Amino acid sequence: MDRLERDIDDIRRKWVPDGRLGVFQVAVAGGLTGATSSREAQESLRRLAKEAGLTEDVRLLPDHVVGHDQVAIVTAALAPLLGDTRLDAARVTEALHGEALEILDRQNDWLRVRAPDEYVAWVHAGYVATGPVDWGKDWAERATARAVGAEVQTDGGRRRLPLGARLALRRDGTVELADGVVGAIVVGEVRREGELRAEARHLALPELAQRSYGGAPYLWGGRTEWGIDCSGLTQAVYAARGIPLRRDSDQQFSQGREVALSADGAGYDAGDLLFFTERGRVSHVALWSGGGAGRIVHSALPCGGVGIEDLFGSEPRMTRLRANLVGVRRFVGESVGTD
């Protein structure tokens, strides 16, 4: 790596250290070209190009390519958010019906978006409707209800929605979906978010996880009862309490308050998050169940999805998991920061 490339990488590490939370794609092709979502990174690149006697054409996202419509609202039951502009690209997370996404860039039928948890990924335009910022704010103000095992009957057919999907509840008891279609609830229910949050505060987090997602299959990048991964589960359960967590396990590990590690779980509270490594990197998270039983609630591929397991069990897999426990974090009643 030559000096110029090192300087570019230094700028990336300073201003966009986590590529999941921002954009920094810069190449040297006669000059500096590319795109970034960081104004500070763009300004640093301009200074670097000037000092090196190079031209600079690094776009600051979002820009004119996005145009007037800067918000995308998910109109499908859920939208896979992918790592690239290919249908077979890795699913890095999901956005649920009614969630609003900030549009950062466009590429043919693909939108680069920032999710409410700040995760940056690509979504196909077919999953969303787009509009200006005021349009997105209007929907957010009206969509104060959440689906709970709901199916909605519309003139066009029945629509099934995942837990947590956002809808607008109308005075006559019908609901408005994110695409403006109105329908009647025929299965499950749609509840005000405030009511659900108040109920969630009366449940232990592991119990809430089991009630809402117990038996859900494991799905990398999943966030719903139709398929969910380990950090998607912990993020969703804490969100039900109104506590925002980052999307991935290593990001969640940087949040919350540290709890001292214990050989037998002494000092852990129900709902504490336990973090595990694989090849030196945090890659798994589980909820401590509490009650002195030594159990965890998690979504794991070896057990097919969301379930309860004995962390101190004698099975070789649990022995390995215990050996890879690197930290415990507590979030309830704490300020959830990233410092």
Residue ranges of predicted features:
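Short glycine/threonine-rich beta-strand-turn micro-motifs
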Residues: L21-R46
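Boundary regions of SH3-family modules and the immediately adjacent low-complexity/disordered segments
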Residues: G22, E43-H68, R86, Q107, ...
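Aromatic- and glycine-rich peptidoglycan recognition patches
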Residues: T130, K137, R192-E193, L261, ...
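Structural motif
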Residues: E99, A165, G271-D272
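Short alpha-helix capping/helix-loop boundary micro-motifs
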Residues: D84-A90, A150-G157, S254-D264
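Active-site nucleophilic cysteine motif
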Residues: G221-R241, L245-D248
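Short, well-ordered loop/turn sites that connect or cap secondary structure elements
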Residues: A89, A95, L161, G267-D269
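...with weaker cross-activation on analogous glycine-rich loops/strands in unrelated enzymes
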Residues: L245-G305
